[in-house]
């Protein structure tokens, strides 16, 4: 199952790199993870993002895909929608450049958890973010 992590980002390439590295280090089946980022084309750090994309494609080449999409300034939700249209994942995970994945083998744990939805194939799930608990689905995972 391919997991696409969709992340709008603005003016925080260092956070973005930390996020990519954390996902990479915590992932078991890297070939099943795609990371897509949306960057506004007026972002003051656009050159740093372009450099990060080149660097990330080499350093994290085990990932299925790593890509930065540059476009018109827009809201986070519209950026997520644009990234969703371009991704190849079976599962879409909403990301944020200030996240840090800490759970080892999160991808395999997610596979096990999502098996319960095999028949329905329509669901929303989320990981415990350490802040909202069960009160709020901060970064949804959708089919």
Predicted features along the sequence, with ranges:
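Short beta-strand-to-loop acidic/aromatic patch adjacent to the donor-nucleotide binding site
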Residues: 89-100
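Cell-envelope/extracellular polymer assembly enzymes that use nucleotide-activated donors
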Residues: 2-4, 34
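Acidic donor-binding segment of Leloir-type glycosyltransferases
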Residues: 23-69
